[in-house]
Amino acid sequence: MSSTSRGSAVPWWKEPTKDQWYAYIAAWLGWTLDAFDFTVFLLIMAPIAQEFGVPLIEVTAVFTVTLIMRLAGATASGWLADRLGRRTPLMISILWYSFCNLAAGLSPTFTFLFVARALLGIGMGAEWPAGAALAMESWPVRSRGFMSGVLQGSWGLGFALSALAYGFLYGPLESMGAGWGWRGMLILGVLPALACVWIRIYVKEPEVWTENKKIQNTTKKQVTLPLFAIFKRKYLWNTFTGCLWMAANFCVYYAIWAMLGTYLQKELGWTPAQVAVPVFWGNIITFLASSFWGGMSEKIGRRWALMIPCAISILFVPIYLNTTDPTWFLAIFMLFICFVGGKDALNPGWLSERYPTEVRATAAGFVYHQGAVWGAAVAPLLTYFAVNQSMGFAKPMMYATIGSLVVYVVAVFLGPETKGKVMTADLEVIEVEVPA
């Protein structure tokens, strides 16, 4: 890895080597395309419910199970990435979620769709720990915060891409025959598999992981159970605050986005093309906000770069969710996203900096995706209160978003400051497990 200092006259984008750029691009591709495959489902839940004749809450259960299965995929992939390297699990995960989405698009029954999307969750969860470790270990220290924001914010680009596809392709596909609108959206999700060819040819393992693995082999010491290691006393508080942070993070995200399309269509009477506007531009702004606040973390620290935008964003929630005029809704919602869009900026960077190399992928994968399990409850709960309790979606979405943001800010405040931390190949966890 480059050791260029923060005061170097070399521009930050010239500091990384070609191999470091390739590693980062691989992680970026995996995450952005992962986002497309997952988020497109949020836009087509209503027509799926109509085609299979099931209540909307049962379709949201598909979304819930997909999120829960992410934890299984992340835990397995993290273990593989720490043992075998970051690259192979990344390729496996991309192939997995791509072909599961294809299978979902060809579903003959709702049960088949349910199973295909549940399996997709495994591949989706498996992508993040391998990709995040690959990117953050490869990247130079001085711009890691900014590039963490670019990487995680690219989920917004994937979501924007799915919104764009929905806005332009759903109607023409549906005109080919009833049901081909939502099926076509899912079938498009097989295209990310092509990225694996590029990763296989051009991407190398991070030097810090390679060196760490050599030391483990030389000393004949390995962390056999990395998931248990992160709950040892040395890392317990770190793991607890990280889990709380990610649980709140996922709840915020799905309180905002999970039922937004359904809310706009069913309660405000928007067309699919109209719904695509806030989804598309909101996610473009999410990418920009994530990149901006990630860059700010190099100046004001990791914690403040997350707490400030999220605390400010709370003020906008009751305003946009009590606005029915399309123009005002769009304006206030976009302003809200400028701040709340920064909440994910440091997911790859801060989680990677909190743990040593031997367990980094396992730790980051588990801490991040256990949050998805909590987030999985959001859509069914919102639907229950909106439909079964006749509250409509606006109030449940507002309460869930504000409450989760408050917990988010507290969790970040309790976490460690890691700005400028250098990732090394030293054996840290093994020294705890096997006393000298």
Where are these regions (language model features)?
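Central cavity-lining transmembrane alpha-helices of secondary-active solute carriers
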Residues: 64-77, 280-292
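Extracytoplasmic gate region of multi-pass secondary transporters
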Residues: 42, 235-287, 375, 379
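C-terminal transmembrane helical hairpin of 12-TM major facilitator-type secondary transporters
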Residues: 303-347
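Helix-breaking motifs and short loop linkers at transmembrane-helix boundaries and internal kinks
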Residues: 53, 85, 106-112, 140, ...
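Glycine-rich segments within core transmembrane alpha-helices of 12-TM secondary carriers
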Residues: 145-170, 367-379
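Cytosolic juxtamembrane N-terminal segment immediately preceding the first transmembrane helix
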Residues: 1-36, 41
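Conserved MFS/SLC helix-loop-helix module at the cytosolic interface between two early adjacent transmembrane helices
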Residues: 72-108, 300
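Cytoplasmic helix-loop-helix junction between adjacent transmembrane helices
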Residues: 116-153
